[in-house]
From Swiss-Prot:
Active site: 183 (schiff-base intermediate with substrate)
Pathway noted in the entry: Phospholipid metabolism; phosphatidylethanolamine biosynthesis; phosphatidylethanolamine from CDP-diacylglycerol: step 2/2
Taxonomy of the source species: Bacteria, Pseudomonadati, Pseudomonadota, Betaproteobacteria, Burkholderiales
Cofactor: record remark: Binds 1 pyruvoyl group covalently per subunit.
Family annotation (Pfam families): PS_Dcarbxylase
Record-given protein name: Phosphatidylserine decarboxylase proenzyme
Record text on subunit structure and interactions: Heterodimer of a large membrane-associated beta subunit and a small pyruvoyl-containing alpha subunit.
Regions crossing the membrane: none
Cofactor(s) required, per the database record: pyruvate
Bilayer topology annotation: Peripheral membrane protein
Length: 217
């Protein structure tokens, strides 16, 4: 299954167009060196909003990474959004990571819940419960098991975008949201899920398997 989205995220088109137009105008009036700082800004905008194709593993028990970044949490804890004990795996995104968020599994959106909050460094544990965040509870299509994905805003990222609704059916690797300029995604899994990543490991959205969750009969 191929990733069916453009190479530049749609969220970035207005920013990229604005930066490019201003750079061209300054280039015309002040020359290359005068416009160089603006061209550098344009390149930064281009790299930030990149959204490259990714391979999507097809193993039925695979729970995929919802975002690019670095693993900062692998632990047993409470899932406050689905009201259960869970295995929590958190992915921290810095400003240089791709910031599209993609579904970790095939399933139905059972619950969406937005929480206003603070904007502390998303690399800190307390960001999970104190920062602005958006929780998506998904019931797996194959066996009804629940996985919760939580978009968490960060110190710089202050805009969470989510494009799905309760009742929507998601496919693994499907793009469902975006967080601008540094953030994290928390994944809550059933406690019998087997993590495939460790703290400090770098992961790629859709391409990296976070954990194995056996299909129940």
């Amino acid at each position: 299954m191929n990733y069916p989205h453009p190479l530049i995220a749609r969220e970035g088109w207005p920013f990229l167009a604005g930066a490019f137009i201003v750079s061209v105008l300054v280039h015309i009036s002040a020359g290359f060196w005068g416009a160089l700082p603006l061209w550098i800004v344009t390149l930064f905008v281009l790299q930030f909003f990149r959204d490259p194709p990714r391979p999507i593993p097809s193993a039925p028990n695979a729970i995929l990474a919802p975002a690019d970044g670095r693993i900062v949490v692998v632990e047993k804890t409470q899932d406050p959004y689905a009201g259960r004990e869970a295995l929590k795996i958190s992915v921290f995104m810095n400003v240089f990571n791709v910031h599209s968020n993609r579904s970790s599994l095939d399933g139905k959106v059972e619950k969406l819940e937005y929480f206003p909050g603070k904007f502390v460094n998303a690399d800190l544990d307390k960001a999970s419960m104190e920062n602005e965040r958006n929780a998506v509870v998904i019931r797996r299509a194959s066996d009804g098991q629940v996985v919760t994905l939580v978009q968490v805003a960060g110190l710089v990222a202050r805009r969470i975008l989510c494009y799905i609704n309760v009742g929507d059916m998601l496919s693994r690797g499907q793009r469902y949201g975006f967080i601008r300029f540094g953030s994290r995604v928390d994944v809550y899994l059933p406690t019998d899920a087997r993590p495939r990543v460790t703290i400090g490991e770098k992961v790629s959205a859709s391409a990296t398997v976070l954990a194995d969750l056996d299909v129940r009969a």
